[in-house]
């Protein structure tokens, strides 16, 4: 019984080198090794899971291009040219400082898969699983873009030169330079010069703002301002003064005619109604008026004498 009790006694908890604390010492060494061998992977939760998924997506969308370093190239210039950051270039090329860039002959550039830089190149086969397994294009494939640009430039330059040659041929055909004497050649050249001079003058005199002011010059604008501001008001005032004078003269003639009709005797009025011009009557009426005026002037003098 005593032996059984001794076997059932519980020893103190022991701490292993792995950092696991065992409260009971009845387990054998084989059980301990099995527990140490079992390693459980914890699931990522929250932001860590999102970060890992986004990092994997970014790695899948990135393609690494190799570029030969030339004179005058810098990290900032390459980053601006390929629309990436300097930090990404350093991370791909394992550069610690900017000075390490000058020790390289070629540099790796991370570029998005579906971008304007890679749309003319052949897409890689298969899916990328890690950063180091990204596809690197050879220098021959990278030279496709500059070769196409040079071909397009040479074609445009050749077409331009052909058009210039055609224009020169047409000018030579149009102008007849065959002359017998030097004087005729000089006269022909001077005539052509005189033709081109007025065209050049017209082009120089042309106003760059032509059309904004209906094509009028500054002097025409000044004339219009003088007409509207000075000449028009003067004519307006003169017109109204003439109208006022005409009205006054008309009223004066009407009043004089009324007075004359009151002074004329009834016999003269009858002659005027019958259509006879009363010349004598008018003379006599004037004499009668003079006599009446003289009598009226003499009457107060006679009264004073009496």
UniProtKB/Swiss-Prot annotation:
The modification Phosphoserine is found at residue 55. GO terms for cellular component: Golgi apparatus; Golgi membrane; plasma membrane. InterPro entries: LYSM1-4, LysM_dom, LysM_dom_sf. The keyword GTP-binding does not apply. Keywords: Cell membrane, Glycoprotein, Golgi apparatus, Membrane, Phosphoprotein, Transmembrane, Transmembrane helix. It is found in: Cell membrane; Golgi apparatus. It comes from the Eukaryota. Residues 65-109 form the LysM domain. Residues 1-217 are extracellular. Glycans are attached at residue 7. It is a single-pass membrane protein. This is LysM and putative peptidoglycan-binding domain-containing protein 3. It comes from Homo sapiens.
């Amino acid at each position: 019984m005593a032996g059984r009790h001794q076997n059932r006694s519980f020893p103190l908890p022991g701490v292993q080198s792995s950092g696991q604390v065992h409260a009971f010492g009845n387990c054998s060494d084989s059980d301990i090794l099995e527990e140490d061998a079992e390693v459980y992977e914890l699931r990522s939760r929250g932001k860590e899971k999102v970060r890992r998924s986004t990092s994997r997506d970014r790695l899948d969308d990135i393609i690494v291009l190799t570029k030969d370093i030339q004179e005058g190239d810098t990290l900032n210039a390459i980053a601006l040219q390929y629309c990436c950051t300097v930090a990404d270039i350093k991370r791909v090329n394992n550069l610690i400082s900017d000075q390490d860039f000058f020790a390289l002959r070629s540099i790796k550039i991370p570029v998005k898969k579906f971008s304007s830089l890679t749309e003319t190149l052949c897409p890689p086969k298969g899916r990328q699983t890690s950063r180091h397994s990204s596809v690197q294009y050879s220098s021959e494939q990278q030279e496709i873009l500059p070769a196409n640009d040079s071909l397009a430039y040479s074609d445009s330059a050749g077409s331009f030169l052909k058009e210039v040659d055609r224009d020169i041929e047409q000018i030579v055909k149009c102008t007849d330079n065959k002359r017998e004497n030097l004087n005729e050649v000089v006269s022909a050249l001077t005539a052509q010069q005189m033709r081109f001079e007025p065209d050049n003058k017209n082009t120089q005199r042309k106003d760059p703002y032509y059309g904004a002011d209906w094509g009028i010059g500054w002097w025409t604008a000044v004339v219009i301002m003088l007409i509207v501001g000075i000449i028009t008001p003067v004519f307006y005032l003169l017109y109204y003064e003439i109208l006022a004078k005409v009205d006054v003269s008309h009223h004066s003639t009407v009043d004089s005619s009324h007075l004359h009709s009151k002074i004329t005797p009834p016999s003269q009025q009858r002659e005027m109604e019958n259509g006879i011009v009363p010349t004598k009557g008018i003379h006599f009426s004037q004499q009668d008026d003079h006599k009446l005026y003289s009598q009226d002037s003499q009457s107060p003098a006679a009264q004073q004498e009496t």
